[in-house]
Regions:
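...captures the hydrophobic TM-helix bundle architecture rather than a specific catalytic motif
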Residues: 1-168
């Protein structure tokens, strides 16, 4: 990687970190919107097979709802205003030249990015994504027999949320 690219990615400047947060939020918007489109396609044509997938089962629809809600709430509505715009605007508003702990600020971004990758990795778990909704309320989250994805998929989902909480 050349120096200019690594300087932008591994920076401690608050403005660049704010832009990285906004890019992460934009990526979450794109993935969440694609999941929303898949849900809407299924609602319009419930018996039509999806390309590259086949017929969508009710558990798959619940998994899409779970992942769409998680992405939009945690990685869009939390990351963009609180981390992205706060890093861009807040230091300039208070007259600071830089953040008090710039390396900690950069580490928080990379933890959020890792949490995003872990969350996307839920789709590649053999049992599938969890079907408990973005709130993760019982009974769907507490009963392993509620459906596929409630085993390893739920564990990976919880690991993603735990890493995301560490980043904030």
């Amino acid at each position: 990687m050349n120096g200019a690219m690594s300087g932008r990615l591994f920076t401690t400047a608050h403005r660049r970190i704010g832009v990285l947060y906004l890019y992460l939020s934009l990526a979450a918007v794109v993935v969440g919107t694609l999941l929303s489109l898949l849900m809407r396609i299924h609602r319009v044509w419930p018996d039509a097979p999806l390309p590259f997938y086949g017929l969508m089962k009710p558990e798959d629809y619940l998994a899409l709802v779970t992942m769409h809600g998680t992405l939009m709430i945690f990685f869009v509505l939390t990351v963009a205003p609180q981390s992205g715009f706060a890093n861009l605007v807040l230091p300039a508003q208070i007259g600071a030249r830089q953040m008090a702990f710039p390396r900690l600020n950069a580490a928080a971004f990379w933890l959020a990015f890792i949490a995003f990758l872990i969350l996307i990795g839920v789709f590649f778990v053999p049992q599938g994504a969890p079907i408990s909704g973005w709130t993760n309320y019982p009974p769907l989250s507490a009963v392993a027999a509620a459906g596929p994805g409630q085993g390893a998929g739920m564990d990976v989902w919880l690991a993603s949320i735990a890493v995301f909480c560490l980043s904030s």
